[in-house]
From Swiss-Prot:
Annotated protein name in UniProt: Protoheme IX farnesyltransferase
Family label: Belongs to the UbiA prenyltransferase family. Protoheme IX farnesyltransferase subfamily.
Catalytic reaction list: heme b + (2E,6E)-farnesyl diphosphate + H2O = Fe(II)-heme o + diphosphate
Organism of provenance: Cereibacter sphaeroides (strain ATCC 17025 / ATH 2.4.3) (Rhodobacter sphaeroides)
Enzyme class: transferase
NCBIfam families: cyoE_ctaB, PRK04375.1-2
Length: 310
């Protein structure tokens, strides 16, 4: 009797697969925060310049995603959450992801510099380098503080948007950077609480893997305690106002409540309800950031009518 083995042949890559390399979900957050940074800056920007600037910031974010998928293909193949990405699934070859990432990086940086200013282009270039090299190639696989330090990569977009409009930085753009930077650890650690097995199987030293869930819960609370007053203080900057203050107080009250609940939970309780509280906190943290930046944008939109700001 002859054994017949059927080998599944990877399908041919389509446009959607190459687009997925750019991490469109992450790109949407980058575009939104960069757009807010650009629109609330105290400078008048021609609509075409603004549109072009956001386009190339988005392209730079996508380039970072493609480079990350190229480098992380080995661990993405192990993790349930990422194994169906184009490279680990065998649909897109690693070299294609690398080539696309490098090409888009060059186009994004050069064109942003030509369309806006060199400072914004330099900041975009540094952001791509920080995410692709400092975070992906170094921090992610070597330290449980990977997302703490690496979180800077995701915090730069509003600064880049601000730089497109003004050609520099300010207290307000630094505040937006700090808001995302301090939000990143509790956001990803809440994910790691219910995805610990994925990270341990892939050999990624997330805090849950190196120090356990109990310590991670304490860190979520600690960062929430640092994030909340920072977020509320933004109401008293040049981009804040009463509307932002109300939104920030409500969101950060909910943030602290959720962080305390996570800190108090024991593993038996969490396993019994399949980490429902942790999953809820993770979902809330996504709305948390969008709503803060939405409130900042609303304050700027109301100012011409004498309603925004103090």
């Amino acid at each position: 009797m002859t054994d017949i083995r059927i080998t599944e042949v990877p399908r041919e890559a389509g446009f959607g697969d190459y687009f997925a390399l750019l991490k469109p979900r992450v790109m949407s957050l980058v575009v939104f925060t960069a757009l807010v940074g650009l629109l609330v800056a105290p400078a008048t920007v021609h609509p075409m310049i603004a549109l072009t600037g956001i386009l190339f910031i988005a392209l730079g974010a996508g380039a970072s995603g493609a480079l990350n998928m190229w480098w992380d293909a080995d661990i993405d193949r192990v993790m349930k959450r990422t194994r169906n990405r184009p490279v680990p699934a065998g649909v897109v070859q690693p070299g294609e992801a690398l080539g696309l990432g490098l090409a888009l990086s060059g186009i994004a940086v050069v064109m942003l510099g030509l369309a806006t200013n060199l400072f914004a282009a330099g900041l975009l270039a540094f952001t791509i380098f920080f995410y692709a090299v400092v975070y992906s190639m170094w921090l992610k696989r070597t330290t449980p503080q990977n997302i703490v330090i690496g979180g800077a990569a995701g915090a730069f977009p509003p600064m880049i948007g601000w730089a497109v409009a003004t050609g520099g930085v300010s207290l307000e753009s630094l505040f937006m950077f700090a808001l995302i930077f301090m939000w990143t650890p509790p956001h990803f650690w809440s994910l790691a609480l219910f995805m610990k097995t994925d990270y341990s199987d892939a050999g990624v030293p997330m805090l849950t893997v190196t120090h356990g869930r109990r310590v991670t819960r304490g860190h979520v609370l600690a960062y929430a305690l640092l994030l909340a007053p920072l977020a509320v203080a933004g109401a008293f900057t040049g981009i804040g106002g009463p509307l932002y203050l109300v939104v920030a107080l409500a969101l950060n009250g909910w943030l602290l409540r959720g962080a305390v609940r996570i800190w108090r939970r024991d593993e038996a309780e969490a396993e019994a309800d399949r980490y429902r509280t942790e999953k809820g906190f993770f979902r809330f943290s996504l709305y948390y950031l969008f709503l803060h930046f939405g409130a900042i944008l609303a304050e700027a939109a109301l100012k011409p009518y004498g309603l925004g700001g103090w």
